[in-house]
Amino acid sequence: MDDEIKDMEGQTPEEEIQGQDSHSDYKPADRFDASAVHHLSGMYKNWFLDYASYVILERAVPHIEDGLKPVQRRILHSMKRMDDGRYNKVANIVGHTMQFHPHGDASIGDALVQLGQKDLLIDTQGNWGNILTGDRAAAPRYIEARLSKFALETVFNPKTTEWQLSYDGRNKEPITLPVKFPLLLAQGAEGIAVGLSSKILPHNLNDICDAAIKYLRGEEFNIYPDFPTGGSIDDSKYNDGQ
């Protein structure tokens, strides 16, 4: 025992750690090795940019091509895979979507309820809450959903969809959905990312159709938000994002 203590007295902390029994092969970096030194300022800058871009692209901001956030796109993709014309329990849809979305069942359930309350892409059954009174939806095991006929007609087309591997590489998921309709304007979008946020107000379905026809004819058109719960807006600076 005394011999072991004497041997350890001349060791550096790194050598002491390496000499201890461990189940890990990890070896601490040598503080005298210049190549192993990481400056805090550089680490913060690089890692923060990685984190910010991930939140922007993978969590909070909708894609302009289909108007959907990743969780919304994965929900619709899962519902299309499950679709047999009948209603599915929301809890079942949430569980299926977790194959593609690695951020927990709560975020999937909340996003699904928000999509259902817009009454555009999802045909709902049960107590889905009320946007006029602020009442919450019932628990996922009590409410049901299926894709609406509008969604089946305008959102999906496997032949024109670009695919990528899911987060664990076990499944394929769409990069964006080939939506035939300006869904971003119809649903609106709101998300807070890192360094930026998005807030696009919803628009009236009939106004969007009229504007699309005029656009295809090369005619001028004006289109302004329309609030499902009512309200008024000063649109004098709307085109400037204010």
Language-model segment annotations:
Residues 1-241:
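Catalytic phosphate-handling regions of large nucleic-acid enzymes and associated NTPases
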